[in-house]
Swiss-Prot record:
Gene name in the database record: hisA
Compartments it resides in: Cytoplasm
InterPro entries: Aldolase_TIM, His_biosynth, HisA_bact_arch, Isoase_HisA-like, Isoase_HisA-like_bact, RibuloseP-bd_barrel
Major enzyme class: isomerase
Biochemical pathway: Amino-acid biosynthesis; L-histidine biosynthesis; L-histidine from 5-phospho-alpha-D-ribose 1-diphosphate: step 4/9
Reactions listed under catalytic activity: 1-(5-phospho-beta-D-ribosyl)-5-[(5-phospho-beta-D-ribosylamino)methylideneamino]imidazole-4-carboxamide = 5-[(5-phospho-1-deoxy-D-ribulos-1-ylimino)methylamino]-1-(5-phospho-beta-D-ribosyl)imidazole-4-carboxamide
EC number of this enzyme: 5.3.1.16
Lineage: superkingdom: Bacteria
BP-aspect Gene Ontology terms: L-histidine biosynthetic process; L-tryptophan biosynthetic process
GO MF annotations in UniProt: 1-(5-phosphoribosyl)-5-[(5-phosphoribosylamino)methylideneamino]imidazole-4-carboxamide isomerase activity
Organism the protein comes from: Pseudomonas paraeruginosa (strain DSM 24068 / PA7)
UniProt protein name: 1-(5-phosphoribosyl)-5-[(5-phosphoribosylamino)methylideneamino] imidazole-4-carboxamide isomerase
CDD domains cross-referenced by the UniProt entry: HisA
Protein family according to the UniProt entry: Belongs to the HisA/HisF family.
Length: 245
């Protein structure tokens, strides 16, 4: 399992939100490229970038920062989400050197777009499913749908999606522990690999994900915990590497 540091971009700065609320943002750095360097130096093997402005505006806003990070670390797998709602945007990021694009809102509202994207950019597409009480949320979490997460995930199996980033909104940015049960249930219900997101606070939370013994969980995204120092990237990755399932 990979430990994947998150860099959330708002107005060119690196921030963290609590429960997806744009008005509840903590700025951790005004130099996201330097922040990426910190996590790379700390031993991370993959980065998770989010264009928060893009998620709310429906188009890339912090694209220059994303490109700068991708060009600085051409051998590091980077995944980007936020405002990805067209094939043109995906092409822009792929050309910039990004390894994976995460389709969120559009995957829920127009599921057929995921198939189009997978055909145009095979192996490059991740679906981001954000949930509240098992139901999918969209538009920067502003709307909660009547669609069950597991039902939607199964729909994408035939498309060739590389992974699902699963976020429990009630946990995100609160550092109260990951929703292991829901994450494992999703991973067991679909053939698509799952990346856990939201609520990871410390090594104990990583251990709980490992203890779920769910091969389908291939990574864990962490944000506030690594910024506030309750989790060390290298230590967490070592725990994963040494875990015997």
């Amino acid at each position: 399992m990979l430990i994947i540091p998150a860099i959330d971009l708002k107005d060119g700065a690196c921030v963290r939100l609590r429960q997806g609320l744009m008005e509840d943002a903590t700025v951790f750095s005004d130099d996201p490229v330097a922040m990426a360097a910190k996590w790379v130096d700390g031993g991370c093997r993959r980065l998770h970038l989010v264009d928060l402005n893009g998620a709310f505006e429906g188009k890339p806003v912090n694209g220059e920062v994303v490109t700068a990070i991708a060009r600085r670390y051409p051998d590091l797998p980077i995944q980007i989400g936020g405002g990805i709602r067209s094939l043109e945007t995906i092409e822009h990021y792929v050309r910039a050197g990004v390894s994976y694009v995460i389709i969120g809102t559009k995957a829920v509202k127009q599921p057929e777009f995921v198939g189009e994207a997978c055909r145009a950019f095979p192996g490059k597409v991740i679906v981001g499913l954000d949930a509240k009480d098992g139901f999918v949320a969209t538009d920067g979490w502003a709307e909660v749908s009547e669609v069950q997460v597991i039902d939607l995930a199964r729909r994408f199996e035939a498309d060739g999606v590389s992974a699902i980033v699963y976020t429990d909104i009630s946990k995100d940015g609160m550092m109260q522990g990951c929703n292991v049960e829901a994450t494992a249930a999703l991973a067991n219900a679909t053939r698509i690999p799952v990346i856990a997101s939201g609520g990871i606070h410390n090594l104990g939370d990583i251990q709980k994900l490992l203890d779920a013994r769910t091969p389908g969980i291939i990574g864990a995204i962490t944000g506030r915990a690594i910024y506030e120092g309750t989790l060390d990237v290298a230590e967490a990755q070592a725990l994963c590497d040494n875990f015997k399932a």
